[in-house]
C-alpha cells in the first residue's frame, strides 16, 4: 500500500465490503473521484482481489477443521493446487517445519471431515496428515489499521 488513504480505504472496505464510493469518500473525507481512482489502482495492483460476503459458518451449521500436512517440497505446489480446488477449504498455507501445508476447512458435518481426511491419507504426495476440529473465537478481523 502506498499511503494512509489506501490503508483507510482497505480497512473501511474490510469492515463493510458493500460500501459504495460515496460512503467511502465520506468515511475518509476524500473526493469520490479520488476514491474511485484509488480503488481502481488497488484492484489493478492486486491489493484488492475481489469483494465477498463474510459468513458466520457456525450459524450455518458448519464445523471448522485445520488440516496439517507433511508434504515433500517437490509436491507442495501440486498438493496446494488440489486443496484450493476443494470448496471446503477456505484458506491454504504453505509453511515451514514438519507440516509444510496447513489448510483451514469448513465442513457440513463430521462425516465430511472424515472423508476429506481419508482422501488425504490416500494421497501419495502427502506423507502425514493431522486434523484438528476448532471452535472459531474470532475470524475475519482486518489486521490493517487505518492511519
What are these model-derived regions, one by one?
Residues 1-147:
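A compositional/biophysical signature of low hydrophobicity enriched in polar/charged and small residues
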Amino acid at each position: 500500500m502506498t499511503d494512509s488513504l489506501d490503508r483507510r480505504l482497505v480497512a473501511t472496505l474490510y469492515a463493510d465490503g458493500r460500501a459504495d464510493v460515496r460512503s467511502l469518500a465520506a468515511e475518509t473525507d476524500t473526493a469520490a473521484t479520488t476514491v474511485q481512482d484509488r480503488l481502481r489502482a488497488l484492484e489493478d495492483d492486486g491489493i484488492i482481489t475481489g469483494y465477498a460476503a463474510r459468513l458466520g459458518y457456525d450459524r450455518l451449521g458448519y464445523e471448522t477443521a485445520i488440516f496439517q500436512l507433511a508434504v515433500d517440497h517437490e509436491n507442495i505446489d501440486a498438493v496446494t493446487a488440489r486443496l484450493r480446488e476443494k470448496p471446503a477449504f477456505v484458506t491454504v498455507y504453505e509453511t515451514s517445519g514438519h507440516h509444510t501445508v496447513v489448510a483451514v476447512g469448513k465442513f457440513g458435518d463430521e462425516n465430511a471431515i472424515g472423508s476429506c481426511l481419508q482422501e488425504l491419507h490416500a494421497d501419495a504426495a502427502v506423507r502425514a496428515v493431522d486434523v484438528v476440529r476448532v471452535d472459531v473465537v474470532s475470524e475475519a478481523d482486518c489486521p490493517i489499521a487505518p492511519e
